[in-house]
Amino acid sequence: AGSGDDGIEIIDISTPSSPSSVGRMTDRDDRTRELDGANGVAITTIGSSTYAVVTGSNDDGVSIIDISTPSTPVIVSELEDGTDTGVCTAANGERCLDGPRDVEIETINGLTYAIVASHKDDAITIIDITNVSNPTIVATMYNSSTKELEEAKGVSIVTIGGSTYVVVGST
């Protein structure tokens, strides 16, 4: 994703020595999109469609984009941070997506989840994207004296011994 370009570029690398641009989507084309400061991108296939889940760190949101036809990506849904009280809790009406930097996708028990690291909220947010038109936040974990999530910036997922883990990098 191009953070300064506020969007995504889709590049065909079928011939690695000759990459070619085939599609793009930017926040500049439509300022209502959650692509300002696009940072993290994760790709998944649900049903017969392929989606890019993109974090917009300046828009404080996440976009789900259908890229099944790479030349014409289409926004399917978006989530934004909501009320910003400075203290990220669901009780404050926030979605804890302030400054999302990275996203990974994992399917667990038949459901597909996007795990988002938000550096300004010092949190990770787990979003059920099985129904891409209606993404639903299922859990959020915040930084605390017993957790190292301050300025969470990177996420990676691994399955070890039948359990699924997210490893979060923070500063």
Where are these regions (language model features)?
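Feature marking well-ordered beta-strand scaffolds used for ligand recognition
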Residues: 1-171
